[in-house]
Amino acid sequence: INDDFLKLDMTEINSSTFNEKFDFIISKRAIQNVLDTQLQINTIENLGNFLDDNGFMVCVESSKNGQENINKERIKFGLEEIMPPYHNLFFDDNVITNYSFKNVRLVETIPFASDFYFITRLVYSRYAKEYLNEKPNYDHPLEKIALSMTGESYTKRFSQIKTYIFKKK
């Protein structure tokens, strides 16, 4: 079992970076820091080169579409839009879903944080503004309730963070 952990610039990975193939490659909110869509695609392609024949790449990244859905609802209720950090380019689900990757295929997208974002960015934000006359507070009980609901997916379209699972072709 190869259980080495490496810290590299993912945009500079090429065919000579590794001498071996991997069962799993995991990215957690890293590819979203690549600020060009094509370079994000290239990064997924390049990482996919290093998966073994039955390998999986698990990417937990922010979703532009989930963020847009949250903001559409926030605007309806007079809440400010939430802008992504300047150092992130959230995944465009349409691009990721429809792109013809050469060596991996997207097998599943899991919107595991939908309920959390729905409650904290919409329900609680409205409650704080309309009834408490205060800004949302991460220590509020509704934040804790929302965290306990993560994974239930009552509200799939509001997941700002999703898991994208790719399998070696």
Each language-model region and where it sits:
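A short, conserved alpha-helix within the catalytic core of class I
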Residues: 33-46
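C-terminal lobe and adjacent flexible extensions of AdoMet/dcAdoMet transferase-like proteins
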Residues: 135-169
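Conserved catalytic loop of SAM-dependent methyltransferase domains
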Residues: 104-140, 158
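Conserved class I S-adenosyl-L-methionine
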Residues: 56-81
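Conserved helix-to-beta-strand junction in the class I
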Residues: 46-53
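A conserved beta-strand element that flanks and buttresses the S-adenosyl-L-methionine
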Residues: 26
